[in-house]
């Protein structure tokens, strides 16, 4: 994950000093891109241990169209707790926009199902896109989507994905987002009988919080280790039928976890 460490180093050393919504303060750059060849390993950061359970269950939660944290909490995942209301609701966040984008005629658009069908039917289309950032609903969301939109691309039998992330918390958020969308690409590829290609991560406001600078230095001082491999144990009948137990990561030998506060 040299690409990720290079980005962290660049922002830590060259980033502009900025204020932010949380009052924490950041070092920030505008516009950065990384590319990961998914044939060369699963892009899971090795310079600190990530909680893979949270990454997988969150993605399954998104794909279910769910916006209440009960499913996450029932499965030991707490990453959305700080933003939920007293009943566990987050408003019309990712899952709602992915699976039930409101149409002007009162119906709803299942973007995920539409894109999956479109890839199978017309792989060369330039319209394989899913958008989570719906301006009409931003004020109703507990947290507006940071990873705002993604696009698939098919060439030579391989499926690639590019994510645009409007707001990128380098230390805590970005490693999760890279792994999540890499996993999503593998799932789509399996359902479409394609190999995986590249995952391209594109960031807008790419930042390190001031209370993550010491942790970033600790991580930068560590030597990256070989990437693990992802194995999907079965091919479900539907993209929406995957379960946590279907995914196996082998060869993941990370450095120890580094604690850091979440900016809420």
From Swiss-Prot:
InterPro entries on file: Thymidate_synth/dCMP_Mease, Thymidate_synth/dCMP_Mease_dom, Thymidate_synth/dCMP_Mease_sf, Thymidylate_synthase, Thymidylate_synthase_AS
- Residues of the active site are 146
Q: Which GO terms describe its cellular component?
A: cytosol
Q: List each coiled-coil range.
A: none
Q: What is its main location?
A: cytoplasm
Q: In which pathway does it act?
A: Pyrimidine metabolism; dTTP biosynthesis
* Location in or out of the cell: Cytoplasm
Q: List the disulfide bonds.
A: none
Gene Ontology molecular function, alphabetical? thymidylate synthase activity
Q: Where does (6R)-5,10-methylene-5,6,7,8-tetrahydrofolate bind?
A: 51, 169, 263
Q: What class of enzyme is it?
A: transferase
Q: What is its EC number?
A: 2.1.1.45
Function according to Swiss-Prot or TrEMBL: Catalyzes the reductive methylation of 2'-deoxyuridine-5'-monophosphate (dUMP) to 2'-deoxythymidine-5'-monophosphate (dTMP) while utilizing 5,10-methylenetetrahydrofolate (mTHF) as the methyl donor and reductant in the reaction, yielding dihydrofolate (DHF) as a by-product. This enzymatic reaction provides an intracellular de novo source of dTMP, an essential precursor for DNA biosynthesis.
Assembly and partners? Homodimer.
Q: HAMAP family from the entry?
A: Thymidy_synth_bact
Q: Which NCBIfam families does the UniProt record give? A: PRK01827.1-3, PRK01827.1-5, thym_sym
Recorded protein name is Thymidylate synthase
Organism, by scientific name, is: Hahella chejuensis (strain KCTC 2396)
Organism ancestry: Bacteria, Pseudomonadati, Pseudomonadota, Gammaproteobacteria, Oceanospirillales
